[in-house]
From Swiss-Prot:
Protein name: DNA polymerase
Pfam families listed in its UniProt record: DNA_pol_B (PF00136), DNA_pol_B_3 (PF08408), DNA_pol_B_exo1 (PF03104), DNAP_B_exo_N (PF08452)
Entry's EC annotation: 2.7.7.7
Induction: Expressed in the early phase of the viral replicative cycle.
UniProt source species: Monkeypox virus
Keyword entries, A-Z: DNA recombination, DNA replication, DNA-binding, DNA-directed DNA polymerase, Early protein, Hydrolase, Multifunctional enzyme, Nucleotidyltransferase, Transferase, Viral DNA replication
Disulfide bond annotation, renumbered to this chain: none
Enzyme's top EC category: transferase
Keyword Ribonucleoprotein (UniProt): no
Source species taxonomy: Viruses, Varidnaviria, Bamfordvirae, Nucleocytoviricota, Pokkesviricetes
Function summary: Catalyzes DNA synthesis. Acquires processivity by associating with a heterodimeric processivity factor comprised of the viral OPG148 and OPG116 proteins, thereby forming the DNA polymerase holoenzyme. Displays 3'- to 5' exonuclease activity. Might participate in viral DNA recombination. Does not perform OPG116/D4synthesis across an abasic site.
Length: 1006
């Protein structure tokens, strides 16, 4: 029997079992049940003394136990690490057992199961059926997984089944209550193992009149009275809410491979199950594959107060307790963890994921026709957009113009769509799927058949969006890749933090190397310095800036320095200069490079003036070996990705290489995380110290380098910053570039693992050509050992606000001057949620203007400053006088919470007062909108005081009174503060700011 592993899960009844859900080549689903064990590692001496004897025991052979406590010394008299070798046993017990002096107890039982039996969680196997006992059709029991799964076979493709769903609930206030608000719609996208896709929506007929129901039937809707009458081939079905809920129960109890929702764990599934129980007393019941355990669908929460999120709110996750092998997957939770977005609402996420440049085909009366294909945007983008358009009802044009779809045609490689849209002047616009221009509260207030049918379209679109996002993010292949890499069940891949997912690969490596790492002392936690961030040399750059990144800097630092808790010889500290000088002189004699590396770090305690960590590089340590494995596997999958021919193979290999990248980059963080199995304070701080020296070294050779006559003169000798080696240190290097090229280079910024180098040219093509040659020369002549850099991009018209804040037009390494550059806003107000739309629109306008000025190159920095400030004053005065912009542009949002130090915090007071006077109260954890409002007769106010008192909560019913105005000056001052930080002339900026607002601006720290 050939099977591919799909998912692993446990039952937690009186008799605990581990289950495998697998699929055969013919599409048949097979469940295999295994005994569940707790695992313990003990020495032979302890094993022999156990009474009663262990349930099962496996010899592990001789293993080396190393004490990895850090040795701190004030001189070079460092004691050797404690190390012992003994025969070890792996004990399996069906129930927890207290065993003294057991080791390796930090690893998960499931990881022990996989590794001890030689099973890959996502592998394909030819099962030896003599080790299988049939329980029922499709379910077997196995007591000997090692022999049963002994033959691994090449991967083969299998079909999967999915249920994507969304619901709509009636509400008359702010949020539906399961006790009073019925479900009006449930929409499903059902994909079975044959690949057949069914789209259907159930509409609650109890919210319609009998006349409307009859009209709906006349229009082609199916009306049913019971579950037995359901026809899943029909797109629209009318039924009572009880029938609607029973159909949901029937679908959710099926054993799909995946049930996918967006925030469904916290809302949709919870609402369905609670409403079902309220109206019928029934529950959604899952049964284990052996039919011996039944559990009710229950959503349980995990509150991790130690990992607080935004505004001090505890990080809460929601989980479904099923035992039938289905993976209930919440896209909302997944995207929150994997993407950094301004908003995690479905419309914002879909807008970010599904966009395409569209060409204007025709302009009509308040309507426009757009076409999109492989000529209007990158290959495949129009095709993806067209897929989403099949169920889409609204399209967002140019970021914020929401247009209703009038007609749509899905073409072979794109689309044609007619939108209800004001006439727009340009020929090319960005089209995206954002917020539908509907008000659900108003729709329920005016509810009738037409509205019910409209809502059905919105609901099925949201259900299908779950499918589109599922495919866009490649969740399925990421799940399989994560299971293989982390040695975890597919259902648990996204459940754990990095400190837990690293345990599987670490355990695998320790068993391969026959190593046990132990500590006898309490882990100490001290702060340490992070990566090097350079101060920007200037604000605006008319010349191009080349961006070079170290490839996996911290992983390669760990490999280069052999940084690991067991390779740490010791840490030498000094309390005075004499001690420091003596230690420095003797260190290199006792611990000569390259076998040893000495790393100067910042002292851990205030009474120390120096701290030096010494690592032995003769035998590769656990962390470097782990990282080398990850990086090698990533390189292997990247190579396979390039050679792959099918889209399935490409998706799998891309997910695998990405997974290895993420887990490799997480190792550095885990070295400094006290609860991690990889915790090593000296290794973590040595890693950042070496990283800082590497970025300073690269900056020193590039800052002032010159290219002429086909020769590149680096600005410094090419000396290894850690110890002398046999490399050629001559800074003059022959290039393959034309001899008439004459350029100078200047380092203008750097951050942790990247260097920004200005070239005195505005030619994109030449800049890319030179940067690629620079990359080759740096890797072959400047860098050493396993360090490599990569030319990432050319930044054109770079505007540096401060450290980690900049705006630019990015030309990637694979592009040219004819390519459409990508606008990058890093750390700026355009990417923040606590900034008004007015501010974002204005700052975007002024950055674009600055960028154009830099491109033209006709003005010096003083002229640019004068022109920008003059224009800004005109715009602000005009807006203040006309007061024409809508209130929506000035609304801000904030999360309501109670985690304030002061009991009378004005934010808390604002919400408390609002809740006293409004039936729709703002709950803890909820975002609310507010704006600064003042009396209409207040003149331009220079000196802004007590601005918190002008905050007003904006809800659906709020209207700006004739005696009120927007307190523009608050917004103008914030906007101006950001704009003056883009300009180079501080004197002019201070003068302008004082004239407008009566105070000096705050300049960002360099």
């Amino acid at each position: 029997m050939d099977v591919r592993c799909i998912n692993w899960f446990e039952s937690h009844g009186e008799n605990r079992f581990l289950y495998l859900k697998s699929r055969c080549r013919n599409g048949e689903t097979v469940f295999i049940r295994f005994p569940h064990y707790f695992y313990y590692v003990v020495t032979d001496e302890i094993y022999q003394s156990l009474s009663p004897p262990p349930f099962n025991a496996r010899p592990m052979g001789k293993m080396r136990t190393i004490d990895i406590d850090e040795t701190i010394s004030y001189n070079l008299d460092i004691k050797d690490r404690k190390c012992s070798v003994a025969d070890m046993w792996l004990i399996e017990e069906p129930k927890k057992r207290s065993i003294q002096n057991a080791t390796m107890d930090e690893f998960l039982n499931i990881s022990w199961f996989y590794i001890s039996n030689g099973i890959s969680p996502d592998g394909c196997y030819s099962l030896d059926e003599q080790y299988l006992t049939k329980i029922n059709n499709g379910c077997y029991h196995c007591d000997d997984p090692r022999n049963c799964f002994a033959k691994e076979i090449p991967r083969f493709d299998i079909p999967r089944s999915y249920l994507f769903l969304d619901i709509e609930c009636h509400f008359d206030k702010k949020f539906p209550s399961v006790f009073i608000n019925p479900i009006s719609h449930t929409s499903y996208c059902y994909i079975d193992l044959s690949g057949k896709r069914l789209l259907f929506t159930l509409i609650n007929e109890e919210m319609l009149t009998e006349q409307e129901i009859q009209e709906a039937v006349d229009r082609g809707c199916l009306r049913i009275q019971s579950l037995m009458e359901m026809d899943y081939e029909r797109e629209l079905v009318l039924c009572s809410e009880i029938v609607l809920l029973r159909i949901a129960k029937q679908l959710l109890e099926l054993t799909f491979d995946y049930v996918v929702t967006f925030n469904g764990h916290n809302f949709d599934l919870r609402y369905i199950t609670n409403r079902l129980e309220l109206l019928t007393g029934e529950k959604i019941i899952f049964r284990s594959p052996d039919k011996k355990e039944a559990v009710h669908l229950c959503i349980y929460e995990r509150n991790q107060s130690s990992h607080k999120g935004v505004c001090g709110m505890a990080n809460t996750t929601f989980h479904v307790n099923n035992n039938n092998g289905t993976i209930f997957f919440d896209l909302y939770s997944f995207i929150q963890k994997s993407e950094k977005l301004d908003s995690y609402k479905l419309d914002s996420i879909s807008k970010n994921a599904f966009s395409c440049m569209g060409k204007v085909l025709n302009r009509g009366v308040r309507e426009m026709t757009f076409i999109g294909d492989d000529t209007t945007d990158a290959k495949g983008k129009a095709d993806t957009f067209a897929k989403v358009l099949t169920t889409g009802n609204y399209v967002t044009v140019d970021e914020d113009i929401i247009c209703k779809v009038i007609r749509k045609d899905i073409l072979e490689n794109g689309f044609k769509v007619v939108l209800s849209c004001p006439t727009l002047p340009n020929d090319i616009y960005k089209l995206s799927f954002g917020k539908d221009d509907i008000d659900l509260a108003q729709m329920y207030k005016d509810y009738n058949l037409n509205i019910a049918l409209d809502m059905a379209r919105y609901c099925i679109h949201d259900a299908c969006l779950c499918q589109y996002l599922w495919e866009y993010y490649g969740v399925e292949t990421k799940t399989d890749a994560g299971a293989a890499t982390y040695v975890l069940p597919q259902s648990m891949v996204f459940e754990y933090r990095a400190s837990t997912i690293i345990k599987g690969p670490l355990l695998k490596l320790l068993l391969e190397t026959k190593t046990i790492l132990v500590r006898s002392e309490t882990k100490q936690k001290f702060p340490y310095e992070g990566g090097k961030v350079f101060a920007p040399k200037q604000k605006m750059f008319s010349n191009n800036v080349l961006i070079f990144d170290y490839n996996s800097l911290y992983p390669n630092v760990c490999i280069f320095g052999n940084l690991s808790p067991e390779t740490l010889v010791g840490v030498v500290v000094s309390t005075n200069r004499l001690e420091e000088e003596i230690n420095n002189q003797l260190l290199l004699q006792k611990y000569p490079p390259p076998r040893y590396i000495t790393v100067h770090c910042e002292p851990r305690l205030p009474n120390l003036i120096s701290e030096i960590a010494i690592f032995d590089r003769s035998i590769e340590g656990t962390i470097p070996r782990l990282l080398r494995t990850f990086l090698a596997e990533r390189a292997r999958y990247k190579k396979m990705l390039k050679q792959a021919t099918s889209s399935t193979e490409k998706a799998i290999y891309d997910s695998m290489q990405y997974t290895y990248k993420i887990v490799a980059n997480s190792v550095y963080g885990l070295m400094g995380f006290r609860n991690s199995a990889l915790y090593s304070y000296a290794s973590a701080k040595s890693c950042t110290s070496i990283g800082r020296r590497m970025i300073l070294y690269l900056e020193s050779v590039l800052n002032g380098a010159e290219l002429s006559n086909g020769m590149l003169r680096f600005a410094n000798t090419l000396s290894n910053p850690f110890y002398m080696d046999d490399r050629d240190i001559n800074p003059i290097v022959k290039t393959s570039l034309p001899i008439d090229y004459r350029f100078r280079f200047r380092s203008v910024y750097g951050d942790t693992d990247s260097v920004f180098t200005e070239i005195d040219s505005q030619d994109v093509d030449k800049s890319i050509e030179i940067a690629k040659e620079l990359e080759r020369l740096i890797n072959s002549r400047v860098l050493f050992n396993n360090f490599k850099i990569e030319f990432e991009a050319v930044y054109k018209n770079l505007i540096m606000q401060s450290k980690k804040k900049y705006t630019t037009m990015k030309y990637s390494a694979s592009s040219n001057s004819k390519s459409v550059p990508e606008r990058i806003n890093k750390g700026t107000s355009e990417t923040r949620r606590d900034v008004s739309k007015f501010h974002k629109n204005m700052i975007k306008t002024y950055k674009t203007r600055l960028s154009e000025m830099l491109s033209e190159g006709r003005m010096n920095s003083n002229q640019v400053c004068i022109d920008i400030l003059r224009s800004l004053e005109t715009d602000l005065r005009s807006e203040f006088d006309s007061r024409s912009s809508p209130l929506e542009l000035f609304m801000l949002s904030r999360m309501h919470h109670s985690n304030y130090k002061s009991a009378d915090n004005p934010n808390m007071y604002l919400v408390t007062e609002y809740n006293k006077n409004n039936p729709e109260t703002i709950e803890l954890g909820e975002r609310y909108y507010f704006a600064y409002i003042c009396p209409a007769n207040v003149p331009w106010t220079k000196k802004l005081v007590n601005i918190k008192t002008y905050e007003t909560i904006i809800d659906r019913s709020f209207k700006l009174g004739s005696n009120q105005r927007i307190f523009y000056e608050v917004y103008f001052k914030r906007l101006t503060s950001e704009i003056v930080n883009l300009l180079d002339n501080k004197v002019l900026c201070i003068s302008f700011f004082q004239r407008m607002f009566g105070s000096r601006p705050t300049f960002y720290e360099a």
